[in-house]
Swiss-Prot record:
Subunit: The PsaA/B heterodimer binds the P700 chlorophyll special pair and subsequent electron acceptors. PSI consists of a core antenna complex that captures photons, and an electron transfer chain that converts photonic excitation into a charge separation. The eukaryotic PSI reaction center is composed of at least 11 subunits.
Organism, scientific name: Antirrhinum majus (Garden snapdragon)
Function: PsaA and PsaB bind P700, the primary electron donor of photosystem I (PSI), as well as the electron acceptors A0, A1 and FX. PSI is a plastocyanin-ferredoxin oxidoreductase, converting photonic excitation into a charge separation, which transfers an electron from the donor P700 chlorophyll pair to the spectroscopically characterized acceptors A0, A1, FX, FA and FB in turn. Oxidized P700 is reduced on the lumenal side of the thylakoid membrane by plastocyanin.
A Pfam family that the UniProt record links to this protein: PsaA_PsaB
Enzymatic reactions: reduced [plastocyanin] + hnu + oxidized [2Fe-2S]-[ferredoxin] = oxidized [plastocyanin] + reduced [2Fe-2S]-[ferredoxin]
Annotated positions binding [4Fe-4S] cluster: 559, 568
Coiled coil spans: none
Binding site for chlorophyll a B1: 654
Transmembrane domains' residue ranges: 46-69, 135-158, 175-199, 273-291, 330-353, 369-395, 417-439, 517-535, 575-596, 643-665, 707-727
Entry keyword annotation includes Metal-binding: yes
Localization terms from the record: Plastid, Chloroplast thylakoid membrane
Key words of the record: 4Fe-4S, Chlorophyll, Chloroplast, Chromophore, Electron transport, Iron, Iron-sulfur, Magnesium, Membrane, Metal-binding, Oxidoreductase, Photosynthesis, Photosystem I, Plastid, Thylakoid, Transmembrane, Transmembrane helix, Transport
Protein name as it appears in the record: Photosystem I P700 chlorophyll a apoprotein A2
Length: 734
């Protein structure tokens, strides 16, 4: 009996119903709530699990390299990146007979394969990989790192190698090592790789371990570094006629500031990127020596925070007390980390398409669309998670005595003002944006499109002009040839930048108009409403006027019975749950906007977006309906084609999504009655009644059913859009 699942909770293990299984799974990672947990074991478990996480990541990336080397067409793709379709891996067992085999045999393969829309081919090519052997050795190296990570994780669970709590709470040492080691040495090493391997590779030189020490990355070697003539490293860059991967038109520079894109690959100059990474490395190596550890020099973070008291008195005691609050709360730290990572992931989405770093990726339209959408959805989940852990911090870790009148306490003190302002902003954005869209819909329906309300985004256009975009006719900053900013950069990076920003074939500073203005505000509505729900959930997590003792009920509770009247739906978990729907909704609008604008750009008919995006029917008809035709035609009486799998996934995604509502709309009582009826039938059916269960079947709790519903809604929503996106883009552009 003692070994029943879950072993971490004897109370749950003795539960006679199926609740034991579901609650066991739900709390498996909530180490804080486990029996016999101590602060020391909590920190050590989390630390060891990080190594397991790393092992999984290394194994997964190793698998990418291995399968492309084994079943892909990397070597033939390298010969002609623009016309050969990159293969991700083979399809072992194509169903649906000969038509399926023919439909999926492409990219020069002998049998059915999947095409890669992840951009790994472009990435590996840019960083200097050229042969299948290179890919295999990369896969082996990552496999080795994966094994090392597993060993390290196991090692740090052994008594002798378990770090103490004081080691985990040594913030200065951790910051120094992460800043210098992670963000300093890593970019420095990457600069080294770019300079020694990738840049020579882009100029037709094949540098590997066997000739690594013989090939000079720069004709003058380290001379300019030691004599202080660093500008020599920037002289003689690749010419605009350079053919990537060959010596034709190649220069000798290794660290440049050219600006703009390589004309052939439409990606940032490798020498610019090497320079960028060197600068980042320098900054963080310095930053990693700022905090006081063994030698009594440098800053103490506690002293810094305690000194942050604005003299005006309008922020009370400022940051006093924050050091211990943050350093003793894993949820606070996780919230900060997730907030940062979420923002960075969204920035990755924005920059991967506008400033592509990998050779030829800008011309692989389906990959561009897939990467943008992927990173925006990931960012959404990570950002909502930040607020979830912020709320858990307020419930489990926040100590009012330690934080009297500091910025954290003052956030709680004026939460009504914060929440009501967010509410006002959301209402304003929602009603005005919908009002404009609906007005325009009605005008088109009545045949008077000239009566639409179309607002030019003049402030955004002015900002684009300030960065050098000339098409709007604003004579300002970098688009004004007489300004000091223009003249200062003219000799170095500006020509490349101006050329790129005014070139209409890339995605840098796209021309915007009334359709962009409207969808921008629709997205702003989604962002503000999501933020409102999340912020309210965190700030009301400890208590509210309606339920002052809320923190005593924990992070997720369904209600406090009928007696209090109206305590359903107000736990911090419920706020997270509602916010995820809004987050998905908002990112839907973001990705619709990005995809439609780019489809029209790539097809050369931007007027379709400009004319149809100003009213809702335009979005429904000319984006969603028009582009789903490939999916609806994925299989027909004439047999299969290569889009059939996406057509099936589109249907399957809708099915998963719709299943979510089964959990979201009907509550416990309905399911409990149904379960009891089914159990009755089971016990009275011959043969079936030979199978017994140890746990009495009961319905999911309200909170659990919501989680299951939300999971199906989210997964179905993303599956459906992924199939739509890839099929509609690859169906047009291959």
């Amino acid at each position: 009996m003692a070994l029943r699942f879950p072993r971490f909770s004897q109370g749950l293990a003795q539960d006679p119903t199926t609740r034991r299984i579901w609650f066991g799974i739900a709390t498996a990672h909530d180490f804080e709530s486990h029996d016999d947990i101590t602060e020391e074991r909590l920190y050590q478990n989390i630390f060891a699990s990080h190594f397991g996480q790393l092992a999984i990541i290394f194994l997964w990336t190793s698998g990418n390299l291995f399968h492309v080397a084994w079943q892909g067409n990397f070597e033939s793709w390298v010969q002609d990146p623009l016309h050969v379709r990159p293969i991700a891996h083979a399809i072992w067992d194509p169903h649906f007979g000969q038509p399926a085999v023919e439909a999926f045999t492409r990219g020069g393969a002998l049998g059915p394969v999947n095409i890669a829309y992840s951009g790994v081919y472009q990435w590996w090519y840019t960083i200097g990989l050229r042969t299948n052997e290179d890919l295999y050795s990369g896969a082996l190296f990552l496999l080795f790192l994966s094994a090392i990570s597993l060993i390290a994780g196991w090692l740090h669970l052994q008594p002798k190698w378990k770090p103490s709590v004081s080691w985990f709470k040594n913030a200065e040492s951790r910051l120094n090592h992460h800043l210098s080691g992670l963000f300093g040495v890593s970019p420095l090493a990457w600069t080294g790789h770019l300079v020694h391997v990738a840049i020579p590779g882009s100029r037709g030189e094949y540098v590997r371990w066997n000739n690594f020490l013989d090939v000079l990355p720069h004709p003058q070697g380290l001379g300019p570094l030691f004599t202080g003539q660093w500008n020599l490293y920037a002289q003689n860059p690749d010419s605009s006629s350079h053919l990537f991967g060959t010596s034709q038109g190649a220069g000798t520079a290794i660290l440049t500031l050219l600006g703009g894109f390589h004309p052939q690959t439409q990606s940032l100059w490798l020498t610019d990127m090497a320079h960028h990474h060197l600068a980042i490395a320098f900054i963080f190596l310095v930053a990693g020596h700022m905090y006081r550890t063994n030698f009594g020099i440098g800053h103490s973070i506690k002293d810094l925070l305690d000194a942050h008291i604005p003299p005006g008195g309008r922020l009370g005691r400022g940051h006093k007390g924050l050091y211990d609050t943050i350093n003793n709360s894993l949820h606070f730290q996780l919230g900060l980390a997730l907030a940062s990572l979420g923002v960075i992931t969204s920035l990755v989405a924005q920059h991967m398409y506008s400033l592509p770093a990998y050779a030829f990726i800008a011309q692989d339209f389906t990959t561009q669309a897939a990467l943008y959408t992927h990173h925006q959805y990931i960012a959404g989940f990570i950002m909502t998670g930040a607020f979830a852990h912020g709320a858990i911090f307020f419930i489990r870790d926040y100590n009012p005595e330690q934080n009297q009148d500091n910025v954290l306490a003052r956030m709680l003190d004026h939460k009504e003002a914060i929440i009501s302002h967010l509410s006002w902003a959301s209402l304003f954005l929602g009603f005005h944006t919908l009002g404009l869209y609906v007005h325009n819909d009605v005008m088109l329906a009545f045949g008077t499109p000239e009566k639409q309300i179309l607002i030019e985004p003049i402030f955004a256009q002015w900002i684009q002009s300030a960065h050098g975009k000339t098409s709007y006719g604003f004579d300002v900053l970098l688009s004004s040839t007489s300004g000091p900013a223009f003249n200062a950069g003219r000799s170095i990076w500006l020509p490349g930048w101006l050329n790129a920003i005014n070139e209409n074939t890339n995605s840098l500073f796209l021309t915007i108009g009334p359709g962009d203005f409207l969808v921008h505000h629709a997205i702003a509505l989604g962002l503000h409403t999501t933020t409102l729900i999340l912020v309210k959930g965190a700030l009301d997590a400890r208590g509210s006027k309606l339920m002052p003792d809320k923190k005593d009920f924990g992070y997720s509770f369904p209600c406090d019975g009928p007696g209090r009247g109206g305590t359903c739906d107000i736990s911090a978990w419920d706020a997270f749950y509602l916010a995820v729907f809004w987050m998905l909704n908002t990112i839907g609008w973001v990705t619709f906007y990005w995809h439609w604008k780019h489809i029209t750009l790539w097809q050369g008919n931007v007027s379709q977006f400009n004319e149809s995006s100003t009213y809702l029917m335009g979005w429904l008809r000319d984006y969603l309906w028009l582009n789903s035709s490939q999916l609806i035609n994925g299989y027909n009486p004439f047999g299969m084609n290569s889009l059939s799998v996406w057509a099936w996934m589109f249907l399957f995604g809708h099915l998963v999504w719709a299943t979510g509502f089964m959990f979201l709309i009907s509550w416990r009582g309905y399911w409990q009655e149904l379960i009891e009826t089914l159990a009755w039938a089971h016990e009275r059916t011959p043969l079936a009644n030979l199978i017994r269960w140890r746990d009495k079947p009961v319905a999911l709790s309200i909170v659990q059913a919501r989680l299951v519903g939300l999971a199906h809604f989210s997964v179905g929503y993303i599956f459906t859009y992924a199939a739509f996106l890839i099929a509609s883009t690859s169906g047009k552009f291959g």
